[in-house]
Curated annotation (Swiss-Prot):
Organism of this sequence: Thermosynechococcus vestitus (strain NIES-2133 / IAM M-273 / BP-1)
Tree of life domain: Bacteria
Example of a GO biological process term: lipoprotein biosynthetic process
Coiled-coil blocks: none
HAMAP family with a match to the protein in the record: Lnt (MF_01148)
This protein's name: Apolipoprotein N-acyltransferase
Subcellular location: Cell inner membrane
Family, per entry: Belongs to the CN hydrolase family. Apolipoprotein N-acyltransferase subfamily.
TM region(s), chain numbering: 10-30, 33-53, 57-77, 105-125, 139-159, 176-196, 205-225, 483-500
Enzyme Commission code: 2.3.1.269
Molecular function, one GO term: N-acyltransferase activity
Membrane topology field: Multi-pass membrane protein
Residues at the catalytic site: 279 (proton acceptor), 336, 385 (nucleophile)
Length: 506
C-alpha cells in the first residue's frame, strides 16, 4: 500500500498523492492509540513506518507534506481534549465564538506538533535516506530525538513519543537518559521495521535483538529499584471537585474554603503528616498577614498544609504551592514556571484578539526556574499542572535534593483523555527520578505512584475525594538524574561523525 515508484518515475504513481496523505493521517491516528487512555504501547513501534517508508521515495517537499499529514493525524487526535474548553459562556463568550476558539486552539497545537514530524520528514528525505541503511537509521533516530528536545523547550509542548510507553510500556528506560531513551528505542524499532521491509536482512536481526534487549533491560531496571528505607511519610490529599467555571465565582470561592477546610480536618483526624491540595485550590491572592479559617485550622492541628493558591508579586501574581508549617506560617513556596499559553498568559501579539480567554484580573508571572521547595521532611520536587510534561523541570529539583514529588493540577474542564495523559507524564517523572509521587488534582485523576512506575492508587474523576497516601523519602540517583540527557549529545556526535566520513570519502 505504501510503496511508491522511485522519484524518477513519478508519473507512474500507484496511489494518488491525496490518497497517500489521507493514509498517512490514518497512520498517525493509529499511532495515537499508543497514548493514554488506550495505551496500546506496542503500536508506537510500527506507527511511524509508513512515514519513514515515504521519506525514501518522495522528494523532500512532498515528504514534508507527508510528515505534516502524519502529524495532524497523530497530534490532532491526541489533543482532542482541547475541545473540552467549549463552552466558554461562563466568561461571557457566546456559543459560536466559543466553539470556534476551542477548535482554533486545537488546530494551532496540532499544527505545532505536525511541524515537528514534517521537519523530520523533510530532513530525512533531503539528507537521511541518501546514506547507507545503518547511517539512515542513525539519522532517523537522532533527528526525531533532537527535534523533540527542541520542541520540549517551547511553550506548546505536551506530546512526546516517550508518552506512548506510559504507564505500561518501556517506562523504565527513562532512568537512563530521560524521555530521549524511550523515544530513541521507539524510533529505532520503527526504522528497523522499515529497513526490514526493504529486504535488509541485517535489519531483521537487529530488530529482534533491539526488541529483546529493550524489553529485558526494562525488566531488569524495574526489579533493581532499591527498597525503601526510613520512616514512611503519610500525605493526605484532597480532590476538591469544584469546576473552574464555578470556583472562580463568589459562591465557588466560598465552597472552596468549605471543602478544603473540611478535607483538612478529616485527614488530620486520620493521622496524616501533611495535607496536599490541588493547583489553585483557593483561587484568591493569599494574604500572609491576615488570619483566615485555613491558617487557624493549621495552627490548631499543627499539621503542615501544602496549599495551591496565588501570591501577589511585582507586576502581577504567581500561581503557587505554599508550604504552611504547623504554625500556619509560610516556610516555603514554589511559583509555577511553565504557564499554560492562552489560559494563564496571553502572548503580546495575541493580546488584543484573545484577552477575554483569561479569567485573571492581573497577569500571571512565571516563577524562577531555580526554586527549591523545602518541607519538614527535606526538599520536595513540585510540578504544577503543565510542568509534568517537562522532564528538565523535575530533574533540576531532583539534583537539588528533591526526595519525593508533589504533582498538583486543576485538569478541569478536560475529561478522560487529558487526565490519563497527564497521569502518564507523572508516571514517567516518578520513574526517571526514582521517586515516590503524590498527584493531587481538582477533578481527577489523583494518584499515588511508586518509584517503579506502578500506580498504587488512582481516584475516580469528577468526585470529591480525600485519601491518605503512604510514601517514602528517597535520595537515590538514576543515570538521568546525575548526567541528564547524555544520549542526545552522543547521537549527535555519531551523526556528525557520519557526515564527516561521508565528506572524506567524496
Amino acid at each position: 500500500m505504501w510503496r511508491l515508484p522511485p522519484k524518477s518515475n513519478a508519473n507512474a504513481k500507484v496511489l494518488s498523492r491525496w490518497l497517500l496523505f489521507v493514509g498517512l493521517g490514518i497512520a498517525g491516528w493509529g499511532t495515537q492509540l499508543a497514548l493514554p487512555p488506550v495505551s496500546g504501547w506496542f503500536l508506537a513501534f510500527v506507527g511511524i513506518v509508513p512515514l519513514w517508508w515515504q521519506c525514501q521515495v518522495l522528494a523532500p517537499l512532498w515528504a514534508a507534506i507527508a510528515g505534516l499529514c502524519w502529524g495532524w493525524g497523530f497530534y490532532g487526535s491526541s489533543l482532542v481534549w482541547v475541545w473540552d474548553l467549549h463552552p466558554l459562556t461562563w466568561i461571557g463568550i457566546d456559543p459560536v465564538p466559543s466553539w470556534l476558539i476551542s477548535r482554533g486552539i486545537w488546530l494551532c497545537l496540532s499544527s505545532w506538533g505536525a511541524v515537528l514530524s514534517g521537519s523530520w520528514a523533510l530532513l530525512m528525505a533531503r539528507y537521511g535516506v541518501r546514506r547507507s541503511a545503518p547511517w539512515q537509521l542513525l539519522w532517523g533516530v537522532t533527528l526525531w530525538c533532537a527535534l523533540e528536545a527542541l520542541w520540549s523547550h517551547s511553550p506548546l509542548w505536551w506530546i512526546s513519543l516517550s508518552l506512548t510507553q506510559s504507564p505500561g510500556g518501556l517506562v523504565q528506560l527513562g532512568r537512563l537518559a530521560g524521555p530521549t531513551t524511550i523515544t530513541a528505542v521507539v524510533m529505532t524499532v520503527n526504522g528497523l521495521v522499515t529497513l526490514s521491509l526493504r529486504q535488509q536482512k541485517w535489519a531483521r536481526v537487529g530488530l529482534a535483538m533491539t526488541l529483546v534487549a529493550a524489553i529485558a533491560l526494562n525488566g531488569v531496571l524495574s526489579v533493581r529499584v532499591m527498597a525503601d528505607r526510613g520512616e514512611p511519610l503519610r500525605v493526605g490529599l484532597i480532590q476538591g471537585n469544584i469546576p473552574t467555571r464555578e470556583k472562580l465565582t463568589p459562591e465557588g470561592i466560598r465552597r472552596a474554603w468549605q471543602v478544603y477546610l473540611q478535607g483538612y480536618h478529616q485527614l488530620v483526624s486520620w493521622g496524616v503528616d501533611a495535607v496536599l491540595t490541588p493547583e489553585g485550590a483557593l483561587p484568591i491572592l493569599w494574604q500572609p498577614q491576615q488570619m483566615n479559617p485555613i491558617t487557624e485550622a493549621v495552627r490548631e492541628a499543627g499539621v503542615p498544609l501544602w496549599l495551591g493558591t496565588f501570591m501577589e508579586t511585582a507586576g502581577g501574581s504567581h500561581q503557587v504551592l505554599l508550604s504552611l508549617d504547623g504554625n500556619g506560617e509560610i516556610d516555603s513556596h514554589y511559583g509555577k514556571v511553565n504557564l499554560v499559553p492562552l489560559g494563564e498568559y496571553i502572548p503580546p501579539w495575541l493580546g488584543g484578539v484573545v484577552q477575554r480567554l483569561s479569567t485573571l484580573r492581573s497577569p500571571l508571572i512565571p516563577g524562577d526556574p531555580e526554586q527549591v521547595f523545602t518541607t519538614p521532611w527535606g526538599n520536595a520536587v513540585v510540578l504544577i499542572c503543565f510542568e509534568s510534561a517537562f522532564s528538565h523541570r523535575s530533574r533540576w529539583q531532583l539534583v537539588h535534593g528533591g526526595q519525593f514529588i508533589l504533582s498538583v493540577a486543576n485538569d478541569d474542564p478536560y475529561h478522560r483523555q487529558l487526565m490519563t495523559q497527564h497521569h502518564g507524564h507523572d508516571v514517567l517523572r516518578a520513574v526517571e527520578g526514582d521517586r515516590w509521587l503524590v498527584r493531587c488534582t481538582n477533578t481527577g485523576l489523583s494518584a499515588v505512584i511508586a518509584p517503579t512506575g506502578e500506580t498504587l492508587w488512582l481516584s475516580k474523576a469528577d468526585e470529591f475525594v480525600i485519601y491518605a497516601a503512604t510514601i517514602f523519602r528517597r535520595q537515590t540517583e538514576t543515570l538521568y538524574t546525575r548526567y541528564g540527557d547524555w544520549l542526545l549529545p552522543l547521537l549527535l556526535g555519531m551523526l556528525s561523525l557520519s557526515v564527516l566520513r561521508q565528506r572524506g570519502w567524496h
